[in-house]
Amino acid sequence: MLKMKTRERPFPELSYANPHQPALARWFIHSVEGLSGRDRFAALYDFWRRQVVPTGERVFSRMLDLIDVGVRIPDQWPPAQLPDTPLVIIANHPFGIGDGIAVLSLAEQLGRPFRVMIHKDLLRIREMEPYSLPIDFSETKDAVKNNMAVRHEAVRLLREGVTIVVFPAGGVATAPKGFGRARDLPWKMFPARLVQEAKASVIPMHFSGQNGRLFHLVSGPMNMAERDGRVAKFVGKASLTLRTSLLIREFARLSGRAIDVRVGNVLSWSELEPLRDRKTLLDRLYRGVFDLAPSLPRRRIPFLPARTKLAA
């Protein structure tokens, strides 16, 4: 049996590889992440978890400072007035790691507790636990049971004044067939259900930009993993492995740059309440986010972007 030689890696939780993947897939993901500068980020993570997290102050804003990523927002933030209702923040998901940290850096400026709905595998980073609600995207009975419990917990927290952050796509935006503008993956019904059950108002946010061309090209066949047929499944799983391995590379590309975000007017519960049909409500939330997108001229998306200097 072939055994892959591996070296001890600092902070193994800072990886998208997981024990449920085949050994070859884990090795490949680790290799690409290493070439993308993962170990440099591990050193910054070590400083962040020891020196920043214990203070409880600007935890995510200071994380962005460490990795030299700015957040450029033309709108007033925090908003001058917030409704006296439970509050949900909903955003698109163009980058993966970068917009996740950016939205949390904005949420912490509201001066109230907050949680983000994230993939359960990301809770390997223990420092994220106090700020997270884990979602299981596998379609098992246990996953359904877990997600129902998480939804009930989210509603309870909303009623207690905790802001909940949701990326309704549940995954990183992808360009159709690898070219053109990236599009959010189909939105899940979860946020509409959450808003209705908690009678929450919503702050829509739109993050501009997208990952590099290579990320989208390798993502093209990922849906084949759900098809019948060994060849289709193999191609689909290989695509997912390649896509996953590039997420840290895409995060590294943001270093030295600013993420542009636009914030819409608060969608009050009184405005959303008449939308009893959840699909209609979800469509309204979707428009609330993507109506904020700036009208940009078509631009060339780099296949292999210039290497960016990582923060020391």
Question: Each predicted region: which residue ranges?
Answer:
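Non-catalytic C-terminal accessory region of glycerolipid acyltransferases
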Residues: 11-13, 148-312
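Catalytic core of membrane glycerolipid acyltransferases/transacylases, capturing the structured
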Residues: 42, 87-143
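Residue-level signal for well-ordered alpha-helical scaffold segments within enzymatic catalytic domains
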Residues: 62, 102-105, 109, 156, ...
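Short, charged beta->alpha transition segments
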Residues: 70-79, 118-121, 151-154
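Residue-level detector of flexible, active-site-proximal loop/helix-junction positions
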Residues: 78, 121-123, 139, 209, ...
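Short coil/turn connectors at secondary-structure junctions
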Residues: 84-85, 111-113, 160-162, 199
